[in-house]
UniProtKB/Swiss-Prot annotation:
The keyword Phosphoprotein does not apply. Monoterpene synthase that catalyzes the formation of geraniol from geranyl diphosphate. Expressed in the peltate glandular trichomes of the leaves. It catalyses: (2E)-geranyl diphosphate + H2O = (2E)-geraniol + diphosphate. (2E)-geranyl diphosphate binds at R286, D323, D327, R466, D469. This is Geraniol synthase, chloroplastic. Belongs to the terpene synthase family. Tpsb subfamily. It comes from Ocimum basilicum (Sweet basil). Binds 3 Mn(2+) ions per subunit. GO terms for cellular component: chloroplast. It is an enzyme of class 3 (hydrolase).
Length: 567
């Protein structure tokens, strides 16, 4: 989670922090419309109010009436959709398609109980075709429900091949295979077969489902960031001749309402950031609250996590400036003092710091303690030790990177990745989210943030973040003179070309996704809410950093505009 940095002559630089790279300005909260995104049409968009004639009182009353009308309509649509999910006379495959559309439109959080009831109910597999079997498999695993991949064996012929002519079935199979777990050879073979056939179909002008196939091969459904996918699919779904008008209307109303909520959250974050005044005092620091907020929406797309997004965006914004101290400004002796002060975590430790470090230390100290107070107030839990441990771990990681650069020696590949997960901000983010959400927290699992190794679900997501970060910014790192990146270290240790190193890293990411898929279905030690956050971190990483050229800044700027400012 990293942002762009100013150019300064340095004694050393460390690897950048990954929760942070991008938006260069925010002169006003509401920006011009983003031309690459089609505005969402709705009978009554909640994110913009039409001009109303009359005095302020009349306008206020009219606006209130419109909002009440929209709210009533929304409640009606929610009830109608719930009834459709609960109807006994609807074929199972139609319910699966409905669930798939609901979740892709970004409104699945309204129907979690009804969706789980459908997915856990008996399903007749006698006449099931490949499309339906793969859809059912994907939906079950996506929602954390166990299902065996052996259901696909019956679709193989005597040569062990699937039907190459069934494009719809192969597309569904390919999407399902992306939820495979390590050791599931059936799904690995299915992915290889389906991907090869689907890629060949793209060269056939009259091939069916050309657009859907191209999208799936670019980024499979399971790997897409929820809110961006909701926006994209709302526009696509409305063009389908058989779309459900009520479902589309509900999705648009909800999207506009969530966008208005995000704008309100951004207003609070930017107000806090300006009052904090950190970058006013530290002119070298990056000023990126908008992008920090984008990451929180990627990790926590559900509206109910509003306060968690706000607190996490604050933490990431401060982390960004600390990264700049280590990466572009601080002298080695000062960094040693700062690291020691973070370990001590008291105000007395701040006294020995240089002036420019004191304000940053105080901002971190106060903001973290405020989060701890809110958790104590809301849940009765004392979590300072847990949060503090992840901050100390991260700052020590920055210090380690500084030593690598200052000493002129590159680390080993595994050493770099393991340290880079921490300096990427992954564990700090998970700790804040886990305790701020507060679901399923026990004494036993709360200790997972005070000792190493961290849980596999967190380290796998963090490794994906680090690997995608390095893939997306390798050119920038090389030009900046960084001693280490995953690409460079793969090339050095494995004697690979840059292209070969990138391919190896992509294979590594695939393997880590299999680990995450296993955690989604089989991890019983952590609540599903935090496991989903881990998968969302991996998704957001790919969305932000996956590109063929160094186009990070424009892409992140586009995402911010599309999600928060384009109606």
């Amino acid at each position: 989670m990293s942002c762009a940095r100013i150019t300064v002559t340095l004694p050393y630089r460390s690897a950048k922090t990954s929760i942070q790279r991008g938006i260069t300005h925010y002169p006003a909260l509401i920006r011009p419309r983003f031309s690459a995104c089609t505005p969402l049409a709705s009978a009554m968009p909640l994110s913009s109010t039409p001009l109303i004639n009359g005095d302020n009182s009349q306008r206020k009353n009219t606006r209130q009436h419109m909002e009440e009308s929209s709210s009533k309509r929304r409640e009606y649509l929610l009830e109608e959709t719930t009834r459709k999910l609960q109807r006994n006379d609807t074929e199972s495959v139609e319910k699966l398609k409905l669930i798939d559309n609901i979740q892709q439109l970004g409104i699945g959080y309204y129907f979690e109980d009804a969706i789980n009831a459908v997915l856990r109910s008996p399903f007749s597999t006698g006449e099931e075709d490949l499309f339906t079997a793969a859809l059912r498999f994907r939906l079950l695993r996506h929602n954390g429900i166990e299902i065996s991949p052996e259901i696909f064996l019956k679709f193989k012929d005597e040569r062990g091949k699937f039907d190459e002519s069934d494009t719809l079935g192969l597309l569904s199979l390919y999407e399902a295979s992306n939820l495979g777990v390590a050791g599931e050879e059936i799904l690995e073979e299915a992915m290889e077969f389906a991907e090869a056939r689907l890629r060949r179909s793209l060269s056939e002008p009259a091939a069916p489902l050309h657009g859907e196939v191209a999208q799936a091969l670019d980024v499979p459904r399971h790997l897409r960031m929820a809110r961006l996918e909701a926006r994209r699919f709302i526009e696509q779904y409305g063009k389908q001749s058989d779309h459900d008008g009520d479902l589309l209307e509900l999705a648009i109303l909800d999207y506009n309402q969530v966008q208005a909520q995000h704008q309100s959250e951004l207003t609070e974050i930017i107000r806090w950031w300006k009052e904090l005044g950190l970058v006013d005092k530290l002119s070298f620091g990056r000023d990126r609250p908008l992008e920090c907020f984008l990451w929180t929406v990627g990790l926590l797309p559900e509206p109910k996590y509003s306060s968690v997004r706000i607190e996490l965006a604050k933490a990431i914004s401060i982390l960004l400036v600390i990264d700049d101290i280590f990466d572009t400004y601080g002298e080695m002796d000062d960094l040693i003092l700062f690291t020691d002060a973070i370990r001590r975590w008291d105000l007395e430790a701040m006294e020995g710091l240089p002036e420019y470090m004191k304000i940053c230390y105080m901002a971190l100290y106060n903001t973290t303690n405020e989060v701890c107070y809110k958790v104590l107030r809301d849940t009765g839990r004392i979590v300072l030790l847990n949060l503090k441990s992840t901050w100390i771990d991260m700052i020590e990681g920055f210090m380690e990177e500084a030593k690598w650069f200052n000493g002129g020696s590159a680390p080993k590949l595994e050493e770099y990745i393991e340290n880079g997960v921490s300096t990427a901000g992954a564990y700090m983010a998970f700790a804040h989210i886990f305790f701020l959400i507060g679901e399923g927290v026990t004494h036993q699992n709360s200790q997972l943030f005070t000792q190493k190794p961290y849980p596999k679900v967190f380290s796998a997501a963090g490794r994906i973040l680090r690997l995608w970060d390095d893939l997306g910014t390798a050119k920038e790192e090389q030009e900046r003179g960084d001693l280490a990146s995953c690409v460079q270290l793969f090339m050095k240790e494995k004697s690979l070309t840059e292209e070969e190193a990138r391919s190896r890293i992509l294979e590594e990411i695939k393997g880590l996704w299999r680990d995450l898929n296993g955690e989604l279905v089989y991890n019983k030690n952590l609540p599903l809410s935090i496991i989903k956050v881990a998968l969302n971190m991996a998704r957001a990483s790919q969305v932000v950093y996956k590109h063929d050229q160094d186009t990070y800044f424009s892409s992140v700027d586009n995402y911010v505009d599309a999600l928060f400012f384009t109606q």
